[in-house]
């Protein structure tokens, strides 16, 4: 049965429709249909409708995709992403748009990811040019730039446009993603993206379907990412009663090890958020138990996150050969750093897996203790979009483009 969309969501929808360009990650089909290949859903979209992500739509047989705004823009420690084996102690310029192809009930970025589904989820979008984003990164001396907050795969055309300029300035770029990719989108972003964090949300297909995805597609994406030479780190948010059984965690760890024992696996603590307000928070003991399973599976780098100072040695990086402490952390803070700038252990000279840049030195802070904390980046108020303005003028799309289907609340995609 068709669901009627809340008027406030419709208003946001109209605001975003003007900020689009013709998509590249698609295939034209007969009858004015298009197949989108930006994510694993591979939506076949009829003229006048949109995909499951609700931000990529078909108008006149042409796929339109988001461009020219951000809903989140912040300077973060790289450890927050988390990337523990790339530019330790640095900051990353993080940006994101709106929308997601999943609908996780425990999403910790739901204000951006679910804005097109949930009237209570809204981060006001702000007009911004790619050049402005790169200039902000340079101003904050950020060697890393990351597309995050919403699902970056569904806004890959925009990310690539920004990253192309960033790379010209020597900035390394990355994705923080659910991993629901396709071979086409990975080939599209590969020239511009070096770092890729995947949320592996569990190891049961039934659970993945509750979230709006399929387990096998995420697993194949992880395998492709590693084979294509991306630096991959994997995060599993431990949700009590959902994905924290010993058997499931062992399966996750074994899979990651089968791809590469050098892939860092982060097990992180769930806290009550969005629609899951009755589930107990993850304990430090739960994280340490999960980490033990990772080491038992043969993984060399296993970390526990979101509970700083409560998980023993599991925030730190040690040499897997001689066990020398290389990076000591407390949350996002680096307390001690001994890794050579070429990524080698100073004691046994073993190479530590990671994305290391020759000549990289950890930023010097007062007392040698980098205490960088996330901070939002201000954008002039004039660039905050007035929700509900006339749509379509920039893209040349008439304001009544799909008003009929929207008023009826018709579901707007068909699986291929």
Go through each PLM region and give its residues.
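Cys/His-coordinated zinc-binding microdomains
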Residues: 40, 54-57, 101, 108, ...
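Short recognition patches in nucleic-acid-associated and regulatory proteins
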Residues: 52-55, 61-66, 326-334
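Conserved Radical SAM active-site core
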Residues: 58-195, 363-372
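Conserved, mostly hydrophobic/aromatic
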Residues: 104, 198, 302
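Residue-level detector of family-conserved "landmark" positions at structurally sensitive sites
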Residues: 117, 147, 176, 234-235, ...
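Conserved AdoMet/S-adenosylmethionine-binding subsite of the radical SAM
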Residues: 127-286, 290-293
């Amino acid at each position: 049965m068709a669901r009627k969309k809340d008027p406030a969501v419709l208003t946001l929808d109209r605001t975003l429709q003007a900020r689009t360009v013709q998509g590249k990650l698609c295939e034209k089909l007969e009858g004015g249909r298009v197949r989108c290949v930006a994510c694993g859903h591979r939506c076949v979209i009829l003229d006048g409708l949109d995909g499951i992500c609700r931000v990529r739509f078909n108008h006149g047989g042409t796929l339109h995709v988001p461009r020219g705004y951000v809903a989140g823009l912040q300077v973060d420690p790289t450890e927050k992403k988390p990337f523990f084996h790339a530019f330790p102690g640095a900051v990353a310029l993080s940006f994101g748009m709106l929308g997601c192809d999943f609908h996780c009930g425990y999403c910790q970025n739901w204000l951006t990811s679910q804005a097109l589904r949930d009237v209570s989820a809204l981060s006001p979008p702000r007009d911004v040019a790619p050049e402005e984003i790169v200039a902000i990164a340079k101003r904050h001396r950020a060697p890393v730039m990351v597309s995050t907050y919403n699902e970056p795969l569904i806004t890959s055309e925009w990310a690539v446009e920004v990253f192309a300029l960033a790379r010209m300035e020597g900035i390394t770029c990355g994705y923080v993603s659910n991993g629901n990719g396709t071979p086409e989108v990975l080939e599209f972003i590969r020239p511009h993206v070096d770092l890729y964090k995947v949320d592996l949300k569990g190891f049961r297909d039934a659970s993945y379907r509750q979230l709006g995805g399929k387990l096998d597609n995420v697993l194949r994406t992880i395998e492709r990412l590693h084979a294509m030479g991306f630096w991959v780190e994997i995060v599993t948010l431990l949700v009590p009663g959902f994905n924290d059984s010993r058997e499931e965690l062992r399966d996750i760890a074994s899979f990651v090890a089968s791809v590469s024992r050098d892939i860092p696996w982060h097990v992180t603590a769930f806290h009550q958020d969005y629609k899951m307000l009755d589930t107990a928070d993850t304990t430090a003991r739960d994280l340490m138990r999960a980490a033990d399973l990772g080491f038992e599976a043969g993984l060399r780098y296993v970390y526990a996150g979101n509970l700083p100072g409560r998980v023993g040695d599991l925030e730190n990086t040690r040499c897997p050969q001689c066990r020398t402490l290389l990076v000591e952390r407390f949350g996002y803070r680096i307390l001690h750093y001994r890794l050579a700038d070429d990524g080698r252990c100073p004691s046994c000279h073993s190479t530590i897996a990671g994305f290391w840049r020759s000549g990289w030195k950890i930023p010097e802070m007062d007392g040698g203790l980098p205490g960088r904390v996330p901070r939002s980046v201000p954008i002039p108020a004039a660039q905050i979009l007035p929700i509900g303005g006339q749509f379509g003028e920039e893209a040349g799309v008439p304001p009544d483009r799909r008003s009929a289907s929207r008023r009826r609340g018709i579901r707007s995609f068909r699986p291929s």
